[in-house]
Amino acid sequence: DLLANKTGADIARIETAEPYRGSHEEVVKQGKREVEAGFTPQINPLSVNLADYDVLAIGTPTWWYTMAPAVLTFLTVNDFTGKTVIPFMTNGGWPGHVIKDMKDKCKGAAFAHEMQIQFDSMGKDHLETSEDVITEWIGQIKMEINK
């Protein structure tokens, strides 16, 4: 939401049709199984039409060193030809290969301003990436949107 608020961009959440249920530990175990299997869950339709956009910032949390399965589904079922994708991810200190994996799945996209945003490795909400770095990145995105 910070990115949308600072850029004035629209926001659309990529959500699974079937929400994750259970304790944090159960959801983590399920997530690991899904990532290891390359599972692509059904996702809900977006609240926006991708055809209306030339620049898309697509973000994901890190799930076992790659993107969340819902984001994998989204990137797999859409064609990004002629669009600029700004891939970004959050992590707790282990970025893995998320950005590379996202780029590999974005068919036809050009890429700009990728970003890794790190939080506390102990599972807390403390931001480790400096706010100055994030502010600079948001400035780059604003310029990309206004080209």
Descriptions of predicted regions:
Residues L50, T76-G82, K105-K107:
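Short, conserved loop/helix-junction motifs that constitute active-site signature segments
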